[in-house]
Amino acid sequence: MDAAAVLLPFRPPECTLRRRRTSAGVPPRLRRALRRPLIFGDLLPTSFRSRGCDLYRRRGMHIRRNATGKLLCSQVKLEDDLDDETCELVSGVDLVIGEDQDSISAYLLKAVKNNNGTGVLLLSDVCGFEYPPTRDFAYQVACHGFNVLVPDLFRGNPWKKGWTVDRYEHWLSEQLSERVARDIDTCAKWMIDEFMAAGISKKLGIIGFCFGGGHLIKALARDEQAYFGTGICFYGANIDPSKGSNINVPVLFICGDNDPFCPVNTLHQIEKNIQSSKVVIYHGRGHGFAHQPESEEDDQAAEDAFAIMRNWLHDNLLVSKN
C-alpha cells in the first residue's frame, strides 16, 4: 500500500438493515464487525454475478464472528432460507490518506468472495462518512463485488442534528469548495495508483449523495486525467447545469420529485449537456430516500434505485472494460 496511506483498526459500522417495513415495526439493528485487513494485491477480478447480497430481504439476523472477525454465511441465522451464494463476505479497513494537514480519514470496503476488481468512490451527504446509513449503503455496494472508498469530506466535523439554520449556514460556509475538491482528487488518485499497482482496473465509479452529489458533478467536470468511468448522483445539492458540458462520461441522476434541494428541472437541464446520461425520478419521494428511507414507499423506491444503480455500474465499468 502507498506510503501516504496509514492503516488503522477498522471501526465496525453500526448499520440499520434496510428492508421493506412490515406491521412488526422498525427493522432490527445490525452490527457488523469487518476487521480483516485489506490487501490490494489480493484483488483478482471475477465474473460479475447479479445475484449479489440481497440485504433488503433478510430478516431476523443473528450475527456471530469467527476468530478472525470474518462474517461467514454459515454463521448468519435467518428466519427464511437463503442460498449461501447470495451472502457475500466484505472486509474493511480504516485509512488516513495523505500527510500532515492534508491527510484525509477514510474507510475502504472490499468484496472478498466476488470481487470484480473495480473501485467506487462514495461521497457522503452532510451527515459525514461515519453516518450509519452511509456505511450501510457502502457495505451493500461492496457486497455486489465493488471496492468502495468513503472519505471524510468534512475533516472530522460533519453537520450535527439539532443545529440552528444559522449554525448550519456558518458551518457550510467553512466547507471550502477548493479544499473539498482537493480531498476528492487526492482520494481518486490514491485509488487509481493502488489499482494500477495491483494490475487491475484503471477506471473508477463515483457515487454522491446530496452535498456529495453536488461535488460529484464538479469532480467529473474537472477530471482531466479521466480517472472516472461513470457517476451516479443521488439528489445532488447545488448542481450547476453548465458543468455538464465538461463531463465526458455517462451520469445517472436519481431523485424524488418532492425534493426541495434537488429540483427536477435542474436535472433535466444538465442531462441535456451530458452524453448518455439518464434521469430517474421517483414520484412522491423526498430528499435522502435512497440511503435513509423513512416509509414503506421510501423502502420500495430505495430498493428499485439500488438495483438501477448496480446495473449502471456494471454496464459502465465492467462491461465497458471487457
Label the model's feature ranges.
Residues 1-55:
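N-terminal chloroplast transit peptides
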Residues 45-48, 62-199, 289-294:
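Serine-hydrolase catalytic machinery in alpha/beta-hydrolase-like enzymes
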Residues 119-121, 205, 252:
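Conserved beta-strand elements of the Class I
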Residues 184-248:
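Primarily recognizes the serine-hydrolase "nucleophile elbow" in alpha/beta-hydrolase
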Residues 247, 253-255:
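Short beta-strand/loop motif that positions the catalytic acidic residue
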Residues 258-262, 287:
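Acidic catalytic loop of the alpha/beta-hydrolase fold
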